[in-house]
Amino acid sequence: MLQQQTQSPGWRVLNRDVIKYIAMTAMLLNHIANIFLVPGTLWYEVLVDIGYFTAITMCYFLVEGFRYTHSRKQYALRLFGFGVVSQVPFSMAFAQNGILEFQDFNMMFTLFLCFCILLCIETIRNRFLRGVLIVLLIFGSLFCDWALLAPVFTLLFRWFGQDQKRLRFSFALSAALFGWLNYTSSVWLYPTAQCLLMACGSMAGIAASGFVILYLYNGQRAARGKKFSHWFFYLFYPVHLLVLGVIRVMG
C-alpha cells in the first residue's frame, strides 16, 4: 500500500498477518482491562492503552483490503455476518449488570460501516448523494464501538494512505485527536496532571500502530497458513468475547 515500502526492506520484517496477530493480542488485553479491572488504576490504564493499537490498525488494513480484495461483496458480507454473530458475545462481555446488556453495536459493525463509506467513495458519482450517504454512515457509527473515530481513521487512510509522508500525518492527527478526546472526557473525573498523563498514554497505541505500519510492515501476507489466518481473525473476535463474557458472568 505504501509507495516507499521497498526502499528500506531490511527494516520491514513484519507481514500483514503478524501485525494482525499483534493487534488481536492488544485487543484481548484491552478487553480484559475493560471487563475486569478498575478504571484509573495503573494496570487498567496500561492494558487499555496497549489495546488502542488495534482499532486504527484494523482500519488501515480495511482500506488496504478494500483496494485488493477479489470480491468486495463477499468482504462486506463477512463483516456484517460476523457483526451479527459477535453481538451477543459483545453484549455479554461488556454488560454492567446481569448476563446481557445492549450498549452499542460491536466493532465488526463499525468496520462494515467504514467499508460502506469506501464503497460510496468508489462507486457513487453524484457528489451530493455520495456526501449525504457518507454522513449518514458516519452518523450510524455513533451507535457502534469506536464511534466516529473509526470512520475518521478510514477516511484518512483512504485519502492519504498511499503516500508515506501523508500517512505519517494521518497517524499523528489520529493520535492527537484521540488524546484530546480522552483528555476532555476525563478532565472532570481526575486531576489535570493525571488527565494529561492518561491522554498521552491513550495516544501510545495509535503511535505504535503508526510506527509498525510505517517502518516495519513489508506489505506482504504470510507465506504459509493464509487461509487459517484469514478465518482466525474473524473467529477470534466473537470467540474471545464469549469466553470473557462467560468468565464475567461466572465470576
What are these model-derived regions, one by one?
Residues M1-G251:
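Alpha-helical transmembrane segments and their immediate juxtamembrane cytosolic regions
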